[in-house]
Amino acid sequence: MAAKEIHFSDIARGELFEGVKKLADAVKVTMGPRGRNVLIQKSFGSPSITKDGVSVAKEIELPNTVENMGAQLVKEVASKTADEAGDGTTTATVLAYNIFKEGLRNITAGANPIEVKRGMDKAAEAIVAELKKIAKEVKDKKEIAQVATISANNDPKIGELIAEAMEKVGKDGVITVEEGKSLQDELEVVEGMQFDRGYLSPYFVTDTEKMEAVLENAYILLYDKKISNMKDLLPVLEKVVQTGNKPLLIIAEDIEGEALATLVVNKLRGTLNVCAVKAPGFGDRRKAMLQDIAILTGGQVISEEVGRTLESATLEDLGQADRIVVDKENTTIVGGKGDKAAVEARIKEIKAQIEQTTSEYDKEKLQERLAKLAGGVAVIKVGAATETEMKEKKDRVDDALAATKAAVEEGIVIGGGTALVRAANKVNLDLCGDEKIGAEIILRAIKAPLKQIAENAGFDPGVVANNVENAENENTGFNAATGEYVDMFEAGIVDPAKVERVALQNAVSVASLLLTTEATVSEIKEDKPAAPAPDMGGMGGMGGMGF
């Protein structure tokens, strides 16, 4: 076991702070409409250019182990915010850094970290409650386009594309982003279905960068029981191999033991391009969803209830689809080869069930099934001139899409960091002592995103924050793109309420953990010995060189 180094109290927190500062300094330059790009060296290929906070944070590893721990914790804030809300990673990082900085100052001066943490949590809770009150529901295509435009770094074309995609498949529909083949961005709506079950083994992955299994022009086997014995599965696998080894997706209650191990081995050897996932849903709902997939893909559910065994399955029982994408959590089936009339009949049947049911839960689940069958999948194909530009643009479209979904979920608030300031100004907590100090830390740090946006645009952050706070109209904020104070809703500068909420909650969570840290334990980095000098023994003949 390697030797460890232990640091205590102010020294420990000081080193953690240095790490947090270094990460925040690299991330915060990307913030706002006039934020700058960050160039990231890759271990192979050309460097990547990004203005996405989480992409920058993910690349940062610091040589000092204690500083690196601080940086990694704040990196987690950015990643978690991106996972939950799809955007707001830079906001979360800037907030975490400023809360930690303000808190550290007070704790060094003698405040009790635990009491300070309590005050911080109470203030954050109160701000979140105010954000929910001022959030405005997203009603039309124009508002959706505004949110998407802001999240795509003020690219109105991407905003329009996402708004159009949402209009076509509905807010419950599935929208995926792919790399296009041309210079133009394109929108394609494909009949398809997505359900929340991912691959049973990462060895099924075909695209290691995205960690996805992509099956083109594939067969689909649907079985309503567990598969653990390989001999039951063998006859149908042999038939698939005889067709020219088309890819196969197996959907069953579960696949385990010998069956799963054999499938993985055959996949790795290249004998069979296969992927296995669990069937979606539970109980009767699982049977209904398997039947939905069967109708959509033109297959049959192999079920002992109708006298069919897995051994008796034929190629005619298998469904077919143009493209199947399976990641860790979801399976998307695009271009199912099912009969259109049968799909329409199934949709009518589900609609009738929705009208008849009295249970809200059942109604919600039926509507989900309806969206999967009727909504289809919208595919946004991103176009660009170079691979570097393509990656950067695709990241922006992914961000914008996630932010738009968040906006539809919890509504929108005025953007540019203004909503947090407005919500904080309405908070009135009756606290005392160190708890009050904790609350004040949050209320001061909450202005950091607004100030950072102003600073990146070349304006005095203090003056801008003061002008926004003292504005008569509650919707007045700072438009960093033009340098004007405007009605943010009218100007279309909006943020999803969920993004602001999640960014604040995650930032407070990590900053309070850092502030209550009293010791750090880290490995001592040993300097690697220099490589030995090459042996010069073979040069003995040079002795006769007299000068």
Swiss-Prot record:
CDD domains xrefs: GroEL
GO CC terms in record: cytoplasm
Record-given protein name: Chaperonin GroEL
Subcellular compartments: Cytoplasm
Amino acid composition bias (Gly residues), ranges on this chain: 537-547
Disordered: region residues: 528-547
The organism of origin for this protein: Nitratiruptor sp. (strain SB155-2)
Keywords: ATP-binding, Chaperone, Cytoplasm, Isomerase, Nucleotide-binding
Lineage of producing organism: Bacteria, Pseudomonadati, Campylobacterota, Epsilonproteobacteria, Nautiliales
